[in-house]
């Protein structure tokens, strides 16, 4: 049975690498629209960008693209920034070198140390591309070099939980009343889903179709339903490895119950029911990721003696 220290570290490596990648993707699209779309109010738009990442009560002097870059891209002390998330992933990897290949460690080092410490708006796209490319490389090496054992499962669960959380935050900040093609395309692009959506929904881009695709599609690897299904499968495997898949009443362990309820809530409801109180639904999805994380901590990372 795996040491809880390794399980915990692998889980957070998965989360932090995914966070760096998703933050770079969302900011790349959002900040480009602010700098290139003249009608947009940069102050309100920057406040909206902060809101995606849960940053509220932002001082007026921070409502500029430059300050967004400083706080959400290059601040290594902030684990929610691109550089900070990579730094946190590297620190977790340092403690479990025995569970990672040399290639993964070197790639994560390169990603962390190579992130620029200062990014100007005129050069931000290069920084975002660097982060996305390096995260893709780290994930590719993890996928190609890791045995599908417990370490892999914890890494995978962390990655997928972060993906669901970031998707929910992004969708929560989206104005559903803006049904323009431009706004919907920006949403899909920020979720790396535009091309996949076009291949699946031939014809005009519609906001209802985009929400449906991002939440409910069963084969798109960035949809909420797909990620939750994969998390459930991984948690089932982990439970079996630890001999506690179900108790005598047929009840799954707490993390699986939380995921199962969330998945059923998506699968067995009409889209109109979900979008009726959309902000609250996305808030609930974020609470699910937090509850599963706490459950994993209690069950695997910091179990009671």
Across the structure, where does each feature detected by a protein language model lie?
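Alpha-helical transmembrane segments and their helix-helix packing motifs
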Residues: 1-305
């Amino acid at each position: 049975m795996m040491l809880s220290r390794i399980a915990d570290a692998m889980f957070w490596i998965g989360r932090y690498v995914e966070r760096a990648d998703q933050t770079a993707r969302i900011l790349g699209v959002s900040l480009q629209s602010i700098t290139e779309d003249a009608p947009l109010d940069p102050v309100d738009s920057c406040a909206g960008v902060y809101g995606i990442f849960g940053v509220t009560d932002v001082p007026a002097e921070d409502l500029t693209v430059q300050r967004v870059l400083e706080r959400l891209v290059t601040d290594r002390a902030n684990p929610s920034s691109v550089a900070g998330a990579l730094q946190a992933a590297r620190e977790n990897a340092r403690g479990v070198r025995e569970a990672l290949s040399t290639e993964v460690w070197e790639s994560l080092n390169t990603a962390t140390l190579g992130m620029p410490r200062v990014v100007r708006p005129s050069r931000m796209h290069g920084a975002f591309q660097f982060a996305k490319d390096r995260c893709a490389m780290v994930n590719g090496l993890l996928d190609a070099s890791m045995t599908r054992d417990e370490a892999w499962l914890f890494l995978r669960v962390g990655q997928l939980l972060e993906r669901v959380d970031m998707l929910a935050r992004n969708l929560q900040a989206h104005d559903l009343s803006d049904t323009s093609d431009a706004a919907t395309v920006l949403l899909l692009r920020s979720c790396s889903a535009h091309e996949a959506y076009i291949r699946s929904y031939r014809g005009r881009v519609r906001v209802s179709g985009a929400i449906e695709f991002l939440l409910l599609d069963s084969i798109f690897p960035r949809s909420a339903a797909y990620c939750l299904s994969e998390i459930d499968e991984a948690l089932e495997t982990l439970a079996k490895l630890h001999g506690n898949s179900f108790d005598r009443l047929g009840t799954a362990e707490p993390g699986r119950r939380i995921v199962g309820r969330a998945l059923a809530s998506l699968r067995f409801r009409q889209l109109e029911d979900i979008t009726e109180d959309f902000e609250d639904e996305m808030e609930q999805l974020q609470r699910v990721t937090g509850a599963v994380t706490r459950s994993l901590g209690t069950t695997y990372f910091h179990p009671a003696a």
